[in-house]
Swiss-Prot record:
Binding note for cofactor: Binds 2 magnesium ions.
Name listed for the protein in its UniProt record: DNA repair protein rev1
Residues bound to dCTP: 240, 283-287, 317-323, 329, 378
Stated role: Deoxycytidyl transferase involved in DNA repair. Transfers a dCMP residue from dCTP to the 3'-end of a DNA primer in a template-dependent reaction. May assist in the first step in the bypass of abasic lesions by the insertion of a nucleotide opposite the lesion. Required for normal induction of mutations by physical and chemical agents. Involved in mitochondrial DNA mutagenesis.
Gene this protein is translated from: rev1
Organism: Schizosaccharomyces pombe (strain 972 / ATCC 24843)
Location(s), subcellular: Nucleus, Nucleolus; Mitochondrion; Cytoplasm, Cytoskeleton, Spindle
């Protein structure tokens, strides 16, 4: 593309050139590029004039007279044919575009998103406009031939035509229209500066990009791909996997919130007689198909599949009638209809799926249980060990669940009962469809022996083939005859032990409260079709906005961002079997870490674009893009906002004691009452050593600053009380709004507070006599107070509650102190925070006694600890970190337990210790504490 710096008249395209006397053919000065391109364009117009002269008079017309037209990219009719049409009808054909205002019309079949934004205010038409104008012999409205539609953000007006169109062939009207359009272009030329040229060179594109270029020329295809600005919204609204993952995360959070508040503290079980656990594995039968046909008795008896209905769409779910014909989930609709021509394909009904799933989990939550594990929207595991004593009790609960689900949703579920997760899962297979089945340790060998090894969890096709090649093993019964040593030697210590255990029905997986989510991701692997590199950049930006939107809903920040690219595999076809699908691909992954947690678009975008360019995949070969936020933490900005709101309430209701007291309004009293209930930790502190009220002179008190007078008066009133008033219960509406870690901490501290008497802090040496009354040392206390007042003329005492301040993260403490104009020295001299609460374990708190207790526990449980004991001890160590703030004590306990098992190498204990360490390290990570060094 060329830019001419000289002002010159726009060529009109008619034969008005005198080639012999034209200065365009004279020599060009050295390095005078502007003059060179000016002469070059003049020569091209001479060629157009020569072409115009060579055309028969009968084929000429002045239809495009006064219009300058350029062509961009591939067109149909071709570039040469369109040029001849324009020139023969009196138009000026522009081969090199100086700027947007140098032409009247741009003819093209396709524009990239960035070029479309550049030319959105210009007349960009399809090639058909040229052809139809010549056919009808008049200039047609260009708006009907736009290459791209107007932006959805721009409001448009609709007008009803009030006059009939003029008859064809009215030359006067045509010329008037042309002159008006020319006049408009001249106006635009004065308003806009010359823009950068854009004509795309398709010769540099790869074969895959050219294929996508041809594919995207179809507007229906283009609107179904990432080229559509609304693609993400449409994609996620109709994506089955997106709905499943979103609902699963929501159900996990909701169930965790409901169970955490009511979960009892589990003591170490001293009664070892009850060794067996009872688990229920509950699952819908053909969930999507059952929900879609639950109100149609006719469809229930016919083969039905749920899919989008397109031939190359995958079946999400099919009922048992369809499975009789060999149809399976994941099969293409076309293949399924070949097996069963009478197959009925129904579309997705995501609203019904969510409604039924919520009814399902409501029933499970209302069932007596210890824990619930959300597997998917239609499948869950329940631990009901504490609620039953035999398998017969489990059968009754399972049948109750089935009947309630049938009544509420008109769908069927199957239930598997077992002493561990593995056996409950295998029992569920036996129970399907529409039944209940139990599997105990006593009959495990009879049930497992005939099954294939691939029926075991964690055994894939490659491991099964390896077992067959080395040991001739096909069934679980054959696997049971292989020694543990041989399996560990072949597959490694851990996986070999896993194979040995699960073949005998031994499973150490446990069900407990769900851990907080560690990542948030956005993935798209359908409809991804790019032509140019900037297409991928544009879509990547939209994808990042979607990721940040999801992070905002979860109120989290990220420490690490990961980019995933799916590239068309070498030799794979450009068009996969699934319409606009990914097909056979190769995956590329790259991550980048931030020094501090962030949700800044600019910071993350800089990392993402750098990673995208580093991977360097041809844009035409990209078949999928994903972004994942890793190492996410809660955003403390909401906590800061809540704290400021409480602080503002305190400042509004502070009472000044200048001669007269001020009554607090009833509305303010209500606010203060609510504040006491919402913040049980906000206990007033006593920052001064005060004598009794009778020994304080009112004249001396008047010499102090007003803010200090108010604090002293308030403290004197509080000295009359022996016990601080404390709310007996927490507001459940407030607790639900808190993040899970903070809610747990508030519950723990509230329980501690209700089990002991809270007394006011004092910075003097307090002594309590037999009657329980405090004696405050009064020597020189008030003199010291006056000395403090003289050193600082005015102490602006901020409205900060230091017990609350102590519980906040360090960075948030600094921010609040800065905003309150409180120096670090003032905090040290005026306030002493209370000592951390010492947490006991089995009435023991010293490290020496704890070591003895752990040694006794390890020696008695030689076959491995009880899982409830493990959870209880892990929770205790977390409380040491959370309440005592004693990382050294927590570290020494974990090291001692690790050393106890180091010599014995007891595998059950090894797994239990790993579980404890994982829980404790998670607590550290949640509190932004570096991991403890155990090994």
């Amino acid at each position: 593309m060329a830019f001419n710096q000289r002002k010159r008249r726009r060529p009109v395209g008619i034969a008005d050139f005198d080639e012999a006397n034209d200065e365009a053919y004279e020599s060009v000065g050295f390095h005078d590029y502007a003059d060179y391109f000016s002469r070059k364009q003049r020569k091209l117009q001479n060629q157009n004039a020569a072409l115009y002269k060579s055309i028969d008079e009968d084929s000429k017309s002045d239809l495009f007279h006064g219009l300058a037209i350029a062509i961009n990219g591939y067109t149909k009719p071709s570039y040469t044919e369109l040029r001849q049409m324009i020139v023969s009808n009196g138009g000026t054909f522009i081969q090199y575009v100086d700027g947007k205002t140098s032409i009247s019309y741009l003819v093209c079949s396709f524009l990239t998103p960035s070029k479309a934004r550049q030319w959105k205010h210009q007349k960009v038409v399809k090639p058909e406009w040229i052809v139809d104008c010549i056919k009808q012999k008049k200039i047609l409205p260009w708006i009907n031939y736009r290459t791209f539609q107007a932006s959805s953000a721009q409001a448009t007006l609709s007008f009803v035509a009030s006059k009939p169109s003029q008859p064809e062939g009215n030359l006067e009207d045509i010329q008037t229209s042309s002159q008006e359009e020319e006049h408009d272009n001249e106006k635009d030329k004065t308003k806009e500066s010359k823009a950068k040229g854009f004509l795309d060179d398709l010769s540099g594109l790869s074969a895959s990009s050219l294929h996508n270029y041809q594919l995207l020329k179809n507007p229906n295809v283009r609107n179904s791909t990432t080229q559509n600005q609304d693609f993400l919204e449409n994609f996620f609204s109709s994506s089955r996997l997106h709905h499943l993952s979103t609902w699963k995360a929501d159900f996990k959070n909701e169930i965790q919130a409901m169970t955490t508040a009511s979960e009892p503290v589990r003591p170490i079980m001293k009664d070892k007689s009850k060794k067996s656990r009872f688990l229920l594995h509950v699952d819908f039968d053909c969930f999507f198909a059952s929900v879609s046909t639950r109100f149609s008795h006719e469809l229930r008896l016919k083969p039905v599949a749920v899919a989008h209905g397109i031939k190359n769409s995958e079946i999400a779910s099919c009922n048992y009638e369809a499975r009789k014909f060999g149809i399976k989930n994941g099969m293409y609709v076309g293949t399924a209809k070949n097996l069963c021509p009478s197959l009925r394909v129904v579309d997705y009904d995501f609203g019904a799926y969510e409604s039924v799933s919520r009814e399902f989990y409501t029933i499970l939550v209302n069932t007596l249980h210890d824990y619930i594990k959300v597997i998917s929207i239609d499948e869950a595991l329940l631990d009901i060990t504490s609620s039953v004593s035999s398998f017969q009790d489990c059968f009754e609960i399972a049948e109750s669940i089935r009947s309630q689900v049938r009544e509420k949703t008109n769908c069927e579920v199957s239930v598997g009962i077992g002493p561990n997760v593995l056996l409950a899962r295998l029992a569920l297979r036996k129970a399907k469809p529409h039944n209940v089945y139990s599997l105990s340790i006593e009959n495990v060998f009879d049930v497992l022996s005939p099954l294939s090894v691939q029926d075991l969890p964690g055994v894939g096709s490659s491991q099964a083939q390896k077992l067959f090649n080395l040991y001739g093993v096909r069934t679980i019964g054959q696997l049971q005859r292989i020694e543990k040593f041989n399996l560990q030697e072949t597959f490694g210590v851990n996986y070999g032990l896993h194979l040995y255990n699960i073949s005998r029905g031994i499973d150490t997986d446990i069900i407990n409260n769900e851990t907080p989510r560690r990542s948030i991701s956005v993935d798209v692997n359908w409809g991804v079709r790019f032509v140019f590199q900037e297409d991928g950049i544009d879509f990547l930006k939209r994808l990042l906005h979607e990721l940040l939107s999801r992070m905002g809903k979860c109120q989290v920040l990220l420490h690490q961002i990961q980019l995933r690219i799916l590239k068309r595999a070498d030799g794979a076809p450009f068009s996969p079997p699934k319409y606009l699908g990914a097909g056979e691909v190769t995956s590329f992954t790259k991550s980048s870490t931030f020094t501090s947690a962030t949700n800044s678009f600019d910071l993350i975008w800089k990392k993402v674009t750098s990673m995208y360019k580093t991977i360097n995949v041809d844009p035409g070969d990209v078949r999928g893009i994903g972004l994942q936020a890793l190492k996410i933490i809660k955003d403390n900005s909401k906590i800061r906002k809540d704290y400021r709101s409480i602080q503002s309430i305190t400042s509004r209701n502070k009472v000044s004691l200048k001669g007269a007291s001020v009554d607090i309004s009833s509305k303010d009293k209500e606010i203060i009452s609510q504040k006491k209930q919402l913040s049980p930790k906000l206990i007033p502190s006593t920052p001064y050593d005060l004598p009794s009220s009778s020994q304080i002179s009112s004249s001396a008190l008047a010499q102090l600053p007003p803010s200090m007078q108010s604090d002293i008066q308030q403290q004197l009133r509080l000295q009359k009380r022996s016990i601080t008033e404390y709310p007996s219960q927490l507001d459940p509406l407030f607790m639900v709004e808190l993040p899970t870690p903070i809610r747990n901490e508030v519950n723990d501290n509230h329980e501690i507070a209700m089990n002991k008497r809270l007394s006011l802090k004092s910075h003097a040496d307090n002594k309590i006599d037999e009657r329980g009354k405090k004696k405050i040392r009064q020597e020189n206390a008030f003199d010291k107070l006056l000395q403090i007042s003289k050193k600082s003329k005015t102490i602006n005492k901020p409205n900060v509650d230091y017990l609350t301040l102590k519980e906040l993260p360090k960075d948030l403490q600094k921010q609040i102190l800065k905003e309150s104009n409180l120096q670090k020295s003032d905090l040290i001299s005026e306030v002493k925070l209370e000592k951390p609460h010492i947490v006991t374990f089995q009435h023991v708190q010293s490290l020496e006694d704890l070591r003895g207790l752990l040694t006794k526990w390890y020696s008695k449980a030689s076959k491995g600890p009880n899982i409830h004991d493990v959870n209880y001890f892990a929770n205790y160590v977390c409380r040491v970190i959370r309440e005592e703030k004693n990382l050294g004590k927590a570290q020494m306990m974990l090291k001692w337990l690790y050393q106890l098992n180091r010599k014995e190498c007891n595998k059950p204990w090894e797994k239990a210790i790993d579980k404890i360490i994982e829980t404790v390290q998670g607590e550290c990570l949640q509190r932004n504490i570096p991991p403890l060094m155990i090994f």
